[in-house]
Amino acid sequence: EAAAKHAWLLEHERELAVASKAAPGAVELVRALHAAGCRLGILTRNAHELALITLAAIGIGDCFLTEDVLGRGEADPKPSPDGLLRLAARWDVAPQKMLMVGDYRFDLDCARAAGAQSALVNLAENPWPELTDWHARDCAELGRMAGLLV
């Protein structure tokens, strides 16, 4: 019974992943970061395979190495810093040189716990200023703040 429920959940999540739409400015920001030579990773509570489907559906799958997409089976869930620290180790970079971009407190908590910088996006107001290094209404605004988008 548990296997059947898991299979149903994955199929439901797969349907959502295929139909995914990018947040405003996200595709442009990711493409600009990728073009600038930035190493990009994903930390998600979704399954790894579904994250890859989502990235492909919104047209940025080619900007991420498969092993840099960490789903619920590859790292402890946020707010644990586990996933961010795994990426830092894989990339041989200090967490302090990394920026965690997210839309919820757990993303910001994850960044703080890892020693990384944080950017809160897709919220008009910032309910967690003590955890936020950067705040932008959307990814396009974050890209402009970083000098990557006009």
Locations of regions flagged by a protein language model:
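Glycine/serine-rich loop-strand microenvironments at binding/catalytic pocket rims
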Residues: 20-42
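Short, surface-exposed loop/turn motifs that are enriched in glycine and acidic residues
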Residues: 16, 40-41, 73-77
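Asp-based, Mg2+/Mn2+-dependent phosphohydrolase catalytic module
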Residues: 27, 31-35, 48, 52-150
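Conserved phosphate-coupling serine/threonine residues in phosphotransfer and NTP-handling enzymes
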Residues: 44-46
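Metal-dependent phosphoesterase signature
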Residues: 1-28
